[in-house]
């Protein structure tokens, strides 16, 4: 919430409302903390049932903020309470719409997130979403700007654009949900076929956003706990505790604490913590570079992981200097892989099925990282692992190492660099 508070201070402005588009599944939104610090009212659309004080607005209810207004437009489908907010300027002209997870750029919000906890089928929700987009958003002026809740990389959609704002006019041309290229039945099929597996922490985050969550100041005070080597080792022996190494992947592979999980701060950190660690109540011990302790705890808390026991004081260096056991991951350049690709080697591709449709290595095994099922793998075999750029493959290597796989090679640079050396790609 710091960005909002800084802007408010900069412009000497009062935060009057906190407009929520829905109960978010992929992060803890910070609405209660912001409300407590500013006195602002939290606003949801119809069907929302928060367990704290909030305004449950009606469809088309108007909120005045100075000389502008925001109109709540109920646009269910992603979830049943999903709403968008249409902003009108000082002249009363439609200016932009904040669509949350209803409409993305080039895509729409997938419906399966909601049906996991609302008891409604994904097909029903997809049909409701079709009606919301065509009856509520499509009739609006093409001149308005569309500000979605996510860009590319979010698990709340299938194939979003990387841009963060566009005109509705352009989206009516290129977005399949708006350009008339699909009937309602075809839209439902397109949206519900091959849905990505949502991270297991999503329902927990929905619950936190709906019921309430721990105050971050308290979480930070408890978690910012420097641990001696002996205390760190003692705590790490508990079965319900994981060691999370958040350093750069190229540093991690050269040496790390055996059994630790790599999820680097420089990548899609929070969503992958949720996908890999899964249970938000898991006790976490952190290994990080100096001065990154607060950032690590903050970003963990944003997805509901508030149970950090502390961090290794002086980082991995103190482990290394104490002559403790160290593990590592071997790497191989795509150019060197080219020399052995035709021999009998086992390749694991941890990218999504959608990514593989754009190109894949022949005979590679697909085990997407967001559903990392290793039951078919043999611990004594050698595996060569890649993703798109190297971040996810290193996460996969750390997970396999933790399970007892010893002969692993991370393919440096991932599929992006594989393409550069003219390997045979299907």
Model-derived features: positions:
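Active-site metal-binding loops of divalent metal-dependent hydrolases
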Residues: 1, 23, 47, 79, ...
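Active-site HxH/HxHxD metal-binding segment of metal-dependent hydrolases
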Residues: 1-74, 93-95, 279
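Hydrophobic "anchor" residues on beta-strands that sit immediately upstream
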Residues: 16, 97, 241, 345
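Histidine-centered catalytic micro-motifs
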Residues: 18-28, 75-82, 146-154, 388-391
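Core dinuclear metal-dependent hydrolase active-site scaffold
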Residues: 62-92, 96-97, 221, 225, ...
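Metallo-beta-lactamase
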Residues: 79-197
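Rhodanese-like catalytic fold shared by cysteine-dependent sulfurtransferases
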Residues: 110-112, 123, 170-207, 211, ...
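Short, well-ordered beta-to-alpha junction loops that form the rim of enzyme active sites
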Residues: 147-152, 158-159, 204-206, 245-248, ...
């Amino acid at each position: 919430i710091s960005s909002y508070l800084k802007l408010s201070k900069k412009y000497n402005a009062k935060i009057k409302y906190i407009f929520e588009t829905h109960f978010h599944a992929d992060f803890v939104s910070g609405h209660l903390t912001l409300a407590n610090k500013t006195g602002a009212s939290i606003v949801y659309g119809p069907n929302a049932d928060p367990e704290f004080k909030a305004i449950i607005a009606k469809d088309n209810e108007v909120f005045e903020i100075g000389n502008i207004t925001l109109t709540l437009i109920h646009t269910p489908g992603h979830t049943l309470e999903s709403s968008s907010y249409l902003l009108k300027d000082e002249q009363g002209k439609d200016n932009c719409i904040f669509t949350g997870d209803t409409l993305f750029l080039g895509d729409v919000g997938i419906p399966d997130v909601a049906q996991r906890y609302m008891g409604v089928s994904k097909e029903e929700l997809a049909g409701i979403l079709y009606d919301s987009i065509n009856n509520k958003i499509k009739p609006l002026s093409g001149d308005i700007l569309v500000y979605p809740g996510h860009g590319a990389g979010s698990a709340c959609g299938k194939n979003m654009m990387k841009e963060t704002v566009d005109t509705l006019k352009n989206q009516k041309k290129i977005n399949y949900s708006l350009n008339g290229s699909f009937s309602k039945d075809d839209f439902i099929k397109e949206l519900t076929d091959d849905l990505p597996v949502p991270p297991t922490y999503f329902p927990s985050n929905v619950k936190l956003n709906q019921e309430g969550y721990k105050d971050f100041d308290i979480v930070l005070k408890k978690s910012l706990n420097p641990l001696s080597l002996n205390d760190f080792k003692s705590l790490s022996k508990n079965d319900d505790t994981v060691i999370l190494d958040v350093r750069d992947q190229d540093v991690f592979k050269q040496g790390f604490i055996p059994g630790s999980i790599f999820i680097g701060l420089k990548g899609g950190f929070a969503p992958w913590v949720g996908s890999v660690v899964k249970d938000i109540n898991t006790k976490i011990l952190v290994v990080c570079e100096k001065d990154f302790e607060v950032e690590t705890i903050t970003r963990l808390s944003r997805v509901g992981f508030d149970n950090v026991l502390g961090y290794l004081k002086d980082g991995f260096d103190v482990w290394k200097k104490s002559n403790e056991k160290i593990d590592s991951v071997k790497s191989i350049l795509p150019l060197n892989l080219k020399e052995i690709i035709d021999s009998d080697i086992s390749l694991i591709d941890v990218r999504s099925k959608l990514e593989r449709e754009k190109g894949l290595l022949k005979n590679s095994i697909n085990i997407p990282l967001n559903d990392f099922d290793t039951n078919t793998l043999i611990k004594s075999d050698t595996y060569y692992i890649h993703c798109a750029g190297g971040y996810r493959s290193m996460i996969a290597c750390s997970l396999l190492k933790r399970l007892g796989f010893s002969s692993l090679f991370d393919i440096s640079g991932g599929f992006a660099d594989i393409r550069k050396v003219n390997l045979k790609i299907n």
